[in-house]
Amino acid sequence: MYRFAPSPTGDMHIGNLRAAIFNYICARQKNMDFILRIEDTDKARNIAGKEEEIKEILNLFGISWQHYYIQSENLKFHRQMALKLVSEKKAFACFCTEEELEAKKELAKKQGKAYRYDGTCEKLADIDVLECEKPFVIRLKKPTHTMKFTDFIKGELSFEPENIDSFVIMRTDKTPTYNFACAVDDMLENVTCIIRGEDHVSNTPKQEHIRASLGYNKAMTYAHLPIILNEEGVKMSKREAHSSVKWLLESGILPSAIANYLIMLGNKTPCEIFTLEEAIKWFDISKVSKAPARFDLKKLLQINREHIKMIKDDELNKILDLNKDLAQLAKFYTQEASTIKELKEKMRAIFNTKDFGEFETECKILKELLKDIELFENYEDFKNELLSKSDLKGKKFFMPLRIILTGNIHGPELSDLYPYIKNFIHELARI
């Protein structure tokens, strides 16, 4: 069983989407169920509407799930599991205040040591715990042995007990911490493989320790994906616009192109342009590079142009909101436009009223002739016919003709454009 477990606390990051895609692919390859779990226990940071937005984005990418869970609905199980650990003396109530802990952290810092919980409350007698009326958290006792696990990408990893420490699993408000809720939910939902970002590597031994302490002995496999760097080689921040999947989609980049790029990023693929369904046939999680991958927006835009060309004409007309068949013309313009947004602007420029500027007189002459000119099969015949009838030459012929046909003074060669725009010339002359 594979899962994708986002939090509804902001726009989906491309790193999260990459994890979703990889989990989905692996689930399909192994004919296993795929879980979508919304991790909403951090109520203060949750943003209204983001849960639905996550589902909408996954649907756009063709990612479906067989099971859907809301983490906060498992709260009673989290509390039951925490109580079980306390009753078995594997966890304990900690009454240390934030101020007391902060003072100990500062002391460790001055001494040049890494802070570790000193076990103050672990030593309390049961009667002292029962009689104490102070707010408390629940801490899980640190493991007694080295925690080891195998990662499909990073290989063998191990963590010593002192690096895991006695960590908090339940807060003072009786809600679970991230690691506890995540570990318990993965156990309850029978998750067998976790693919996520490498920023979660340090969480893995804690989650393994939680499940082991609860007596769960089913093996879990892992793959921690390397971080995505920006174009300057720095870890991509959520504040950078193109780290947001929503921003990429609103910019006119196709879901299929984004998926293509994220699968290819830091990975060896048999070809450069492919669909998600094609990738399912050959994708190998162990082939993903250990090294951080640098995000290249130009490369993504190049891939997007190729995916636009792959779209069926009737579908592209719908995507571009066109009421006529302009798909082939739009695909021709991918030499200049890289996104759906840019293609819409190109089509609007062609079929909207134009500004003739200094060529107003020449444009009027050409428009009259174009209203019923014979639409020759090749551009040279068309051009020569128009030249002879208009009596215009050079710049005063080609510039106004370009404006009438494209709405711009610069653009592709008219001879290249002609086959795609030929059938619309009479219409353009009447705008």
From Swiss-Prot:
Catalyzes the attachment of glutamate to tRNA(Glu) in a two-step reaction: glutamate is first activated by ATP to form Glu-AMP and then transferred to the acceptor end of tRNA(Glu). It holds the Pfam family tRNA-synt_1c. A motif ('HIGH' region) lies at residues 6-16. This is Glutamate--tRNA ligase 1. GO terms for molecular function: ATP binding; glutamate-tRNA ligase activity; tRNA binding. It comes from the Bacteria. It catalyses: tRNA(Glu) + L-glutamate + ATP = L-glutamyl-tRNA(Glu) + AMP + diphosphate. Keywords: Aminoacyl-tRNA synthetase, ATP-binding, Cytoplasm, Ligase, Nucleotide-binding, Protein biosynthesis. Belongs to the class-I aminoacyl-tRNA synthetase family. Glutamate--tRNA ligase type 1 subfamily. InterPro entries: aa-tRNA-synth_I_cd-bd, aa-tRNA-synth_I_codon-bd_sub2, aa-tRNA-synth_I_CS, aa_tRNA-synth_I_cd-bd_sf, Glu-tRNA-ligase_bac/mito, Glu/Gln-tRNA-synth, Glu/Gln-tRNA-synth_Ib_cat-dom, GluQ/Sye. ATP binds at K238. It comes from Campylobacter jejuni subsp. jejuni serotype O:23/36 (strain 81-176). Monomer. The lineage of its organism: Bacteria, Pseudomonadati, Campylobacterota, Epsilonproteobacteria, Campylobacterales. A motif ('KMSKS' region) lies at residues 235-239. GO terms for biological process: glutamyl-tRNA aminoacylation.
